[in-house]
Amino acid sequence: MSFFLSNLTNDSRLWKVSHNSTDLMNSPETLTLSLFCLICLMTLVALVGSIFSLVSLLTMQYRTVVSMLVTSWSVDDLLSVLSVAIFMVLQWPREAPGYFQSLCTTSALLYMCQGLSSNLKATLIVFYNFYTMHRTVVSQSSSWRSGQVLGVALTVWAVSLLLASLPLCGWGVFVRTPWGCLTDCSSPYVLLLFAVYASAFGLLAVLSVPLTHQLLCSEEPPRLHANYQEISRGASTPGTPAAGGRVLCLLPEDVEIPALPGTGSSLSSDMVFAPGQPAASSAGAGKRENLWTPRGSSSFPVSLAQKRFALILALTKVILWLPMMIHMVVKHVVGFQSLPVDMLSFLLTLLASTVTPVFVLSKRWAHLPCGCIINCQPDTYSVAFDGKKSKRKGFEFNLSFQQSYGLYKMTHADYYDDDDENPISYHNPKKYECEATKEPREDNHGVFNTITVEISTTPPLDSATLTGVNKCTNTDIPEPKQAVSEEKGAFSIKTECAINYGEATSFEGPERRLSHEETQKPDLSDWEWCRSKSERTPRQRSGGGLAIPICAFQGTVSLQAPTGKTLSLSTYEVSAEGQKITPPSKKIEVYRSKSVGHEPNSEESPSTFADTNVKIHLEVLEICDNDEALDTVSIISNISQSSTKVRSPSLRYSRKENRFVSCDLGETASYSLFLPTSDPDGDINISIPDTVEAHRQNSRRQHQDRDGYQEEIQLLNKAYRKREAESKGN
């Protein structure tokens, strides 16, 4: 060891490098001990990191094109470690043996080859990300994509090796330097290397400008659940009649579908390959992965994170090689030589071989980076409920009902703070442009959360044949009849939304209908709606794909019916696939109801009992330990009463999932709601019988007393039209 330490000197003076390729045997002054230890440490880090990256990426169950290209990056890092290790060996003996010339040549060849390969692959990865993010048509020739990725990697290695071996063919020479073996900068061969590097760097810089904005400077794309888009493809599902709800929303077919920020217009081109997977099945795997649902260990957020991290690593690697390339050209052009700059440039290129393992963290850090890395917005729920639980948030959504069971899609507007009117936006799969106006309303608990629900069990109606129906939302727009009375304002908030749908995806199969994040822990204290343990495992109905879903409201219930009476409430049982939920009887506090009216069929004569669309106003007062944190949710349902045997849906609403689901109660004519509490054994199920005959009597009364009788639903519709006219006038 003494001969090695004596060869490592603390003298900072370094020998002049010979410019003769035959002088590889003549060693320049050796490294100082501190630099030698630093290079050894960085080489060890690069070795461990490259092995870790290779093992992690090769053992992935499903690999994307980006991950496969990064795997080849790890091989380049191993080549860099090997080239530096060879030169470290050359530092040991005082007198160089005869085989040192071939070792130094091998070290220089590997160093230049991995440098060129690393930079070319950085540009290739950025180009692939740019291509997939802006691709509008999925290629049909993707069956050989996995083989193509390997072929591209081998091609890059072959080109890099060819360029690096030109000095062996007589163009350029390899010389020894104090920090390694490299090409002679006095040869025109340096200009060729710089031209290749500059071309790759220029293309990478051009493509990185839009990618940086898409991948790094935009919020994380929302995690769209299958049932949202599955139902949202039409504003009205079969069995949804014209309803009295007031939600002006554009259909996906009526608006231009823009690309989501950070996602591009085609997400399905990021292919996924499983180990041992046939090449012919790779296309299907890639297609399924990008339906915004997880497939194995690969999901869309992870795929997007891989693109983000790959972009960062590509820029990092190319920039770390920039000082070396510039210094080589400067030495060739003006003959400037600075050994400290040489050493710094070499250390930066060695550092470029240590950053690849960061890519493996893309799966764990799928949410990073966001908002240009620094401006990451806090969680919406934590903003909405941090410290001021007594604030009311207004939101409105649209609900469609299909054949007495199924999943429902809601579109809610931004949350609004009543104090400053500043919206707090959800990470919603749609963009909203909303205006909220308020009308006075008597309320003992402050401003209500207003939710508009449209439900029906009637046969499908052709919107083209309906007069006075908003074809966008399939909602009624009746003619005005009388001036609006201010003291009879029935709603506190009206929201007009223009919804711009971001991505249109399709989902198949009932097993995809119940979609939620299992990693989120239920917590009643922060008012995020939870699921009970009994509902973690989907229990499918025999009649369709509906599973008994997540939890809904908790609190007291009041019913407002056209009869002006308080309807009785009772518990009921829900059965599914042999499993039965029988909650205990619970006393429900019911407030005196208030008539919200109905719209009789104008074509029927007053003497007949015509079928009517009856509106039931249901208010749920949420309960929590803090009395100041009361929050009221209003539901307006449109139930078509055609007979006493009509079947109304049983609804469940999840605020976290932002959707309604329902169960068919068989032949029971009732309007039912499931109300879980913080006590698993104290969950409440209520059933509100539909007083069909009372509704019909009320309808006949309206026909017989046309001149002076007007229900609030008519006033409400007139108020809607007035508001709409004012908004259009402004």
Swiss-Prot record:
Q: Write down the glycosylated positions.
A: N7, N10, N20
Kindly indicate whether the keyword Glycoprotein belongs to this entry: yes
Please give the tissue specificity annotation from the record for this chain.
Answer: Expressed exclusively in brain and testis.
Residue ranges, Extracellular compartment? 1-34, 90-108, 170-188, 330-340
User: Mind telling me which GO cellular component terms the entry cites?
Assistant: neuron projection; plasma membrane
Molecular function GO labels: G protein-coupled receptor activity; neuropeptide binding
Cystines in this chain: C104-C181
Q: Which InterPro entries match?
A: GPCR_Rhodpsn_7TM
State the membrane topology: Multi-pass membrane protein
- Primary place of residence? membrane
List all membrane-crossing ranges. 35-55, 69-89, 109-131, 149-169, 189-209, 309-329, 341-361
> What factors induce this protein?
Expression increased during the early steps of astrocyte differentiation.
Provide Cytoplasmic-side residue ranges: 56-68, 132-148, 210-308, 362-730
- Give the family per the record: Belongs to the G-protein coupled receptor 1 family.
Function recorded in the entry? Orphan receptor.
Name of this protein: Probable G-protein coupled receptor 149
Q: What is the lineage of its organism?
A: Eukaryota, Metazoa, Chordata, Craniata, Vertebrata
Gene symbol of the encoding locus: Gpr149
